[in-house]
Amino acid sequence: MKKFLKNWFTDNRKAGLMRWWLAGMCYFMIGFGTQVGGYSSPIDFIFFLGVGIGLVTIVVYNPIAYNVFRLTRNGEILNHTYRNISGAKKAARNLVEIAASMITVILVYLTYQNLNLLLNQMLELPVETVLIPGEPFGFATLYLLFYTVLSELAAKLRDRKKKKESKE
């Protein structure tokens, strides 16, 4: 059992668990700890939550994950690419990280919205009724799911572009 757990908890899974925890922490701090969480307009909340998670990813997650864990994708170690980027590429990567966080938060918000609308229609409740409110555990789980899917899609597109360039 001990060997199974040691083999199952790979560095990628540990980093994923850390990303899950940070997303839930950001949701808790911004959603419940600031006035943005109480606004009637979800656009403000989505914006600040996306920017907040993006900044926490840049300042907290990336330095820890890429310096403590040995992250791999398709057998390739990703730590070297993170450490060897400097200057304008690093700034562009940070902006892409914030944009990716905002897009992911939008997808999570739309998931909550559509689930609530579906349940309201099924149970014949008023549209304003919120049956599944946002909370840190559910938000972090959906955030990690969508972030993983988006990052895998981006990696496949990058690989496809590299293969196309190498053929030419």
Kindly give the residue locations of the regions a language model identified.
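Alpha-helical transmembrane segments and their membrane-interface junctions
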Residues: M29-G33, A100-L125
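Short hydrophobic helices that act as membrane-entry/anchoring signals
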Residues: K2-D11, A15, F69, R93, ...
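Hydrophobic alpha-helical transmembrane segments and immediately flanking/interface helices
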Residues: D44, F48, Q113-Y143
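Alpha-helical hydrophobic membrane-insertion segments
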Residues: L5, L49-N62, A91, L95-V108, ...
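Loop-to-transmembrane boundary segments
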Residues: F9-W20, R83-I106
